[in-house]
């Protein structure tokens, strides 16, 4: 599987659009700082609702996006 790590919330959206053609059903996207700013929260919402994404996990400090669209679209918030 391909794992892509988006470190910079300010440039994450353009990086996501750039790597999107390389992602497949086995890909995982790690998004840092999903709650650190208004822009980061908006991007996280956009990724969660994108029809090309499947299961998402909100870990508070980062988010995980899986692209296996064969599974039902689902969002989880993990509190620990």
Task: Map each language-model feature to its residues.
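Active-site residues of response regulator receiver
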Residues: 6-8
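A short acidic, Gly/Pro-enriched loop at the edge of an enzyme's catalytic core
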Residues: 1-4
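C-terminal substrate-binding/active-site "lid" region of AdoMet-derived donor-dependent transferases
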Residues: 11-80
């Amino acid at each position: 599987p391909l794992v892509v790590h988006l470190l910079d919330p300010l440039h994450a959206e353009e990086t996501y659009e750039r790597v999107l053609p390389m992602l497949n059903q086995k890909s995982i996207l790690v998004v840092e700082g999903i709650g650190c700013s208004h822009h980061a929260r908006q991007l996280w919402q956009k990724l969660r609702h994108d029809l090309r994404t499947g299961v998402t996990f909100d870990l508070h400090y980062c988010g995980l996006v899986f692209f296996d669209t064969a599974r039902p679209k689902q969002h989880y918030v993990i509190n620990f």
